[in-house]
Amino acid sequence: LDGIEKITGVRPAFEQVDLRDKAATEAVFQKYPAIAGIIHFAASKAVGESVQLPLLYYRNNVVSLINLLELMPAYGVKGIIFSSSCTVYGQPNPENLPVTEDAPHQKATSPYGNTKEINEQIIYDFIHSGAAVKSIVLRYFNPIGAHPSALIGELPNGVPNNLIPYVTQTAMGIREQLTIF
């Protein structure tokens, strides 16, 4: 939040809420009646962990989205940007490269990927049910980076879940080597 404020001159409101808790989530809608749209980036995202703890991933990633979608029309929130994943494309075959948004979805290779596929379908069904809500779904291919000021962006603490933090930690001498297999 400090970084955003330094860059923009505006300190964003921050509410720490478990989106699985519908009553707590609704309290945020009530506190901020002028919400115009939602950018939903909140999700568990470690592929390996999702294999070990699949129910946690389904509960967190799917229930949180359902709660948001159920509350949006009641509070006049007209749009949602959803952070999905390239995992909805599965393991692409060489003949299907490069992958475009028109590429066919394949069976997810992890519970994490499956939650993203399920959530995309939930959003599609919700929008096509006549809900007065519009959606954008973003399918990332391992997003990385930070603002040029370095005030906001990726700052992994502990074991990273993406490649670039491993590379930078190795370059800085925090890690002795980077093993590629």
Language model regions located:
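Conserved NAD(P)H cofactor-binding loop of Rossmann-fold oxidoreductase domains
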Residues: 39-45, 84-85
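Short, well-ordered coil/turn elements that cap or connect secondary structure elements
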Residues: 7-9, 75, 130-132, 173-175
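Alpha-helical substrate-binding/gating segment
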Residues: 143-146, 164-181
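N-terminal Rossmann/SDR dinucleotide-binding element
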Residues: 1-37, 159
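Serine-hydrolase catalytic-loop signature spanning alpha/beta hydrolases and amidase-signature enzymes
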Residues: 46-50
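Residue-level signal for alpha-helix termini/capping positions
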Residues: 30-33, 73-74, 128, 172
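Catalytic helix-loop patch of NAD(P)-dependent Rossmann-fold dehydrogenases
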Residues: 52-59, 63-70, 74, 78-79, ...
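Short, conserved active-site loop motifs that form the nucleotide-linked donor/cofactor pocket
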Residues: 11-12, 135, 178
